[in-house]
Amino acid sequence: MASSGRTGTDDIVSGIMGKWATAFGSLDAGALASLYSTNAFFFGSNPSLYRGHDGVQAYFDALPRWRAPTVKFTDVRTAHAAPDLINVAGTASFVVEEGAQPLVVKITWVIVREDGDWKIVSHHVSSKTPLI
């Protein structure tokens, strides 16, 4: 049987991304916040730093109430950096209104095992357009 090259780390990250995409699709700020560590640092689409569950929930609660937002994660790379730590990098393409051009960003997460579950402890997005 040929190996797909997929690892347990990839499965963990894929599971979190699936939950994240589902919660984003309904703009469920509580469900999104539940995916983050109590010690999370979060840089989203604005310049503010949000911290912990409350900060992440506040960020998502403040977003416009789009009817059917979607996100697609591509070019995902993972590294099991330590027994309880996973590093993630990829691309996230957000479509927030039907017919609109997607907002495509680079995304990095650091995922940590917290209380027996995997949680995002660091979230950062940045422009795919070169700044320099």
Residue ranges of predicted features:
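A beta-strand edge to alpha-helix "cap/lid" segment located at domain peripheries
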Residues: 1-31, 41-132
